[in-house]
């Protein structure tokens, strides 16, 4: 995991921005986020390519910080007052429960179990006095839809605009799911794919499935 540093007394000075630059009010002050630095050359490359404004394909073994860095950089940019991005969408396939529609509850109830790792990541990104303060902050992020979680089973009819999309565990996506995600991308969007073929939960991996992933790596 990348290293994080405490911020000093430096404040970004939101009040000094002109109203012309402040496109909208963000629900959380980005100054609450800790300063996280890359620990490896590959992590540094991830930071650099992201800052260059590119769509990314983060491919690597477990524990290399793919999803953490993607979520950190995305949240930091979304909470910046002058960027066009308003939301972070975390999209993944719930392979073991791909028939998730048969489970009781709404989409939030069905996907809540899979949100726990991301909540833990977000906790590491903010400097809060105690757990209660973090719960309030995280609740605000969710309530304002600054961060949203989607299963590929519920993307139909959705258009994602002004957002940063993180497609996590993408090695578990079939061709139909990949197509569903890409065709839902709207205006002012950035997309990051994170995955590792060695961690695939698919029962069978077809030649077509592998070719789709290889093609995607060259497209982003």
Where are these predicted regions, by residue range?
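Conserved RecA-like ASCE ATPase "motif II neighborhood" in helicase/translocase motors
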Residues: 145-164, 174-178
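Walker A/P-loop NTP-binding motif
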Residues: 71-80
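Inter-Walker segment of RecA-like/P-loop motor cores
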Residues: 105-154
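Pre-Walker A adenine-sensing motif
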Residues: 40-51
């Amino acid at each position: 995991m990348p290293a994080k540093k405490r911020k000093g007394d430096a404040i970004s000075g939101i009040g000094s921005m002109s109203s012309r630059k402040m496109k909208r009010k963000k629900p959380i002050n980005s100054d609450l986020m800790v300063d996280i630095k890359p620990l490896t050359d590959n992590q540094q490359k991830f930071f650099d390519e992201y800052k260059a404004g590119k769509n990314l394909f983060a491919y690597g073994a477990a524990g290399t910080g793919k999803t953490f860095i993607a979520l950190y950089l995305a949240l930091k940019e979304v909470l910046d007052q002058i960027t066009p991005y308003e939301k972070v969408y975390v999209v993944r396939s719930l392979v073991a429960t791909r028939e998730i529609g048969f489970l009781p509850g709404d989409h939030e109830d069905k996907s809540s179990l899979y949100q726990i790792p991301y909540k833990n990541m977000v906790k590491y990104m903010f400097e809060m006095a105690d757990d209660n303060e973090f719960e309030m902050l995280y609740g605000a992020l969710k309530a304002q839809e600054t961060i949203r979680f989607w299963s590929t089973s519920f993307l139909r009819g959705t258009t994602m605009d002004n957002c940063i999309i993180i497609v996590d565990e993408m090695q578990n996506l079939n061709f139909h799911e990949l197509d569903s995600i890409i065709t839902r991308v709207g205006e002012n969007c950035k997309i990051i794919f994170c995955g590792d073929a060695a961690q695939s939960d698919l029962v069978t991996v077809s030649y077509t499935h592998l070719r789709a992933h290889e093609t995607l790596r060259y497209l982003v």
